[in-house]
Amino acid sequence: YAFFFRYTPGLDKNMIGDYLGDPSHFNIEVLREFTDTFKFSGMVLDIALRSYLETFRLPGEAQKIQRILEAFSERFYDEQSSDVFVSKDAVFILCYSVIMLNTDQHNPQVKKKMTEEEFIRNNRAINGGQDLPREYLSELFHSISNKAITLFGQSGVSVEMNPSKWIEL
């Protein structure tokens, strides 16, 4: 299932995200195998997160988002050769923070946008009690502020998989 979800064009990205976030043991194994198809070595967090989240849409349920981000964080952390992060937990916390920043910066209903200083302050001591490098957080802030990560069912692709599409596979 993992390779099918990852490499089959035209599948409904909302359905993939919903499936990957499901709490059943089998679905969690598929999520791990799906996540293991990504190579994150040498990537900055936002680039890796963008490449991951372009293959499906995050479901709206908090527990499903948590499971998906936990799988991503573990894979991202395991693939890093730098010593920026002390644990996968630091990656996980920063992922949530980046998603909140993305929503804050790109949702027109948010009137007062988060500043760079607020983003850096919000992420104090998340790295095993230590701060992440200020430059790293600053680059993340500007990257997200300048270009949104597509989340929660937003899609530029209108082609969805339906029975008539199976012949094209």
Please report, for each region that a protein language model flagged, where it lies by residue.
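Catalytic and GAP-homology cores of small GTPase regulators
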Residues: 1-75, 83, 92-94, 101-169
